[in-house]
Regions:
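Short helix-initiation/N-cap motifs at beta->coil->alpha
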Residues: 61-74, 168-170, 181-187
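Sec/Tat signal peptide C-region and signal peptidase I cleavage site
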Residues: 15-21
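Contiguous mixed-secondary-structure segments that line small-molecule binding/active-site clefts
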Residues: 45-46, 82, 87-186
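Bacterial N-terminal signal peptides that target proteins for export
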Residues: 1-7
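Alpha-to-beta junction loops
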Residues: 53-56, 72-86, 180-182
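Extracytoplasmic "Venus flytrap"
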Residues: 26-43, 63-68
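Short, polar/charged alpha-helical segment
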Residues: 34-59, 170-174
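Cleavable N-terminal signal peptides
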Residues: 8-9, 19
Length: 187
């Protein structure tokens, strides 16, 4: 988990503000507080609030119980909150390039070093009018398990054509449209 890059960006921006007033940023997160991804974000908020005392603080207004997970980006765009922590897949209609993030095997540190974060930020600004600061828990991969030995095509790529996969709304289009798998949603 590479949170230091995002923390450094926020703290650098905060330090550039006038010293006379503490800036308070409001934030929401897409998932319940008990989920590991949200816990990473909340740990980040704690560190910013500790290190930014007197300069910048982040006030978390809640998760999907406060603002629906699919409405959070619009809440940032309209100024209801200042930040949202959520997967790019949740605003796929406005940002189809998010598939590069979903399929990436790079960490956030590597993406920042090679200019990837800057490019993603430019696209966010152009298409959505928002600044993209980075992502948490980078390097987390998606794993597929199967009872039967998988098949590979002539190029050595995994063939999942016709295989039934448990899915969810975040990955279903990728599984069906790109991989050709059959998706079954389970609670």
């Amino acid at each position: 988990m590479h949170k230091s890059a995002l923390g450094a960006a926020l703290l650098t921006a905060a330090l550039a503000m006038p010293a006379s007033a503490q800036e308070v940023l409001t934030a929401v997160h897409a998932f319940p507080a008990s989920l590991i991804y949200t816990q990473s974000f909340l740990e980040f908020v704690e560190k910013v609030n500790e290190r930014g005392e007197g300069v910048v603080q982040i006030e978390v207004r809640g998760g999907p119980e406060a603002i629906g997970m699919f409405q959070q980006v619009d809440a940032v765009r309209s100024g209801v909150v200042d930040m949202a922590y959520q997967p790019g897949s949740f605003y796929a209609g406005a940002f189809p390039e998010r598939d590069a993030l979903v399929a990436s095997n790079l960490t956030a540190v590597e993406a920042r070093a090679n200019g990837g974060i800057d490019l993603i930020n430019e696209i966010h600004q152009e298409k959505m009018g928002l600044w993209y600061l980075g992502w948490f828990d980078s390097g987390v991969t998606y794993n597929l398990w199967t009872v039967n030995e998988p098949e590979f095509d002539a190029d050595g790529n995994l063939s999942v054509d016709g295989i039934r996969l448990r899915g969810n709304s975040v990955y279903n289009a990728f599984f069906t449209d790109y991989l050709g798998a059959q998706v079954i949603d389970l609670p």
